[in-house]
Regions:
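Extracytoplasmic/periplasmic/luminal assembly and interaction segments
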Residues: 54-91
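Flexible, processing/modification-adjacent segments and terminal tails
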Residues: 98-166, 187-191, 249-253
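Short, basic/low-complexity N-terminal boundary segments at the transition from targeting/disordered tails
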Residues: 39-48, 52, 56-61, 119-127, ...
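Interface amphipathic segments
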Residues: 86-102
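N-terminal leader/targeting segments and the immediate start of mature chains
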Residues: 6-66
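Gly/Pro-enriched, hydrophobic low-complexity segments
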Residues: 146-249
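Extended lipid/amphipathic-ligand handling interfaces
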Residues: 46, 71-74, 198-201
């Protein structure tokens, strides 16, 4: 018994020490930058490096993030989210969802929770797919920051998404393409955590996406990204038809 208690105390001490070191030596304050034309031009250069015009012409996408998979009808703002044992169709703009093959014993609150988490996963995981094309979204602020002698781009989202107020510092290569970014976001308590932007692939529509984001604590791979001009190029039948078949079955969340 004493041996087990000793192991427990050593484990707890190790966790506490690791947390202390993370906050003491890795937590960074949000850098200050200068807004203006130079920051906006750097943002446009970054967008051009991934062929943002091709992204605008991409009407449908599918990909995986961890154990979740997604289909996104970008033209109609609809999404299919598979997570855990759930399959959820989302009307993104109107915040309504439909649980495919739902358990009839689920309460309304449980259904709302399932749809809400599907939406949150879509917000996060679609952002990781291509945040570059969102640097001029309404509510964004772009600032030029000198980081280790290099000009970098700080983007703050003052509104929108599921976590407004988040900031990202883009570190670019000589062609303006992202090499990594540093995060100041509400879901990560340590400011300035850095993730790489590696393993770039070109989708069929011509847009470039990064599929590997290394960090010593948590590495994020994206799986099997596919981009098409239209959803009909991906599926013979419209997988979102059930969203519009019976409005009474839709769950607001």
């Amino acid at each position: 018994m004493l041996k087990k208690l000793k192991i427990l105390w050593v484990t707890l001490l190790a966790i506490f020490l690791a947390a202390f070191l993370l906050f003491e030596y890795m937590d960074e304050g949000l850098p200050k930058g200068e807004q203006g034309a130079e920051a906006d031009q750097l943002a446009r250069t970054m967008m051009a490096s991934i062929n943002d015009q091709a992204w605008q012409n991409t009407g449908a996408l599918s990909w995986g993030y961890d154990d979740r998979t997604f289909v996104w009808d970008k033209k109609k703002h609809l999404a299919k989210v598979n997570y855990n044992e759930h399959q959820v169709l989302l009307d993104i703009d109107n915040r309504r969802g439909l649980i495919v093959n739902e358990n009839p014993e689920l309460s309304l609150e449980e259904k709302k929770e399932i749809c809400h988490w599907a939406w949150r996963y879509w917000c996060n995981d679609s952002f990781w797919l291509n945040p570059v094309s969102k640097v001029f979204d309404p509510g964004t602020e772009r600032s030029l920051v000198t980081w280790h002698g290099q000009k970098t781009l700080l983007v703050t989202y003052t509104s929108g998404g599921s976590t407004p107020g988040d900031s990202y510092l883009w570190i670019l290569d000589e062609n303006g393409r992202p090499k990594s970014w540093k995060l100041w976001v509400s879901i990560i308590p340590i400011g300035g955590m850095r993730f790489s932007w590696d393993k770039w692939v070109e989708l069929e529509t011509g847009v470039m996406v990064s599929t590997y984001h290394f960090n010593p604590v948590k590495t994020i791979p994206l799986h099997n990204p596919v981009g098409k001009t239209n959803l009909s190029d991906m599926f013979e039948e419209d997988i979102f038809t059930p969203l519009f078949s019976d409005s009474s079955a839709l769950i607001p969340f």
